[in-house]
Design a protein with these regions (language model features):
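Active-site proximal loop and beta-alpha junction motif in alpha/beta enzyme cores
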Residues: 1-146
């Protein structure tokens, strides 16, 4: 589910406060591509503007730093999630993009949310394999009606 190019640069720039080099669109959200990972780390989005978009999320990404291939932040205030701490769905969109740009199938991604996290992804064509450390935060049983 990689994104396709779309000209939403002015709207995304207004929402994120920094003009992206390129914007992509996918069913889950818009993707803003930047050249500088520091821009992603320092980003202070206008969440009301982000919430007004016609997609669930706005994903900001750039080449990586400190050993990571890429960095990412994901904002989804329209569904009650100002910033997703670590978003697997967004990686289904950005990993094919970065795999192509970087010329490699295995991508180490660092999500720069306040909680943060590292994901180790592999582009296998129709499937994106995502792995990393996790922490159990809730345990229970869900019962669905017959």
């Amino acid at each position: 589910m990689p994104g396709s190019s779309v000209d939403r640069v002015p709207e995304v720039a207004a929402a994120l406060g920094v003009r992206p080099r390129e914007t992509l669109v996918a069913p889950f959200g818009y993707v803003a591509i930047y050249d500088d990972p520091k821009v992603i780390a320092d980003m202070q989005p206008d969440l009301d503007r982000v919430a007004s978009f016609d997609r669930t999320a706005l994903i900001a990404t750039a080449p990586g730093l400190d050993g990571a291939d890429i960095v990412i932040r994901v904002f989804a205030p329209s569904v009650g999630l100002p910033e997703d701490p670590v978003c697997g769905t967004a990686h289904r969109i950005i990993v094919p993009y970065w795999a192509d740009r970087l010329g490699k199938k295995k991508i180490h991604s660092r999500q720069l949310s306040p909680r943060g996290g590292d994901l180790f992804c592999e582009d296998k064509g129709a499937v994106i394999v995502i792995g990393g450390d996790s922490r159990l935060v809730i345990d229970g049983t869900i019962r669905l009606p017959d």
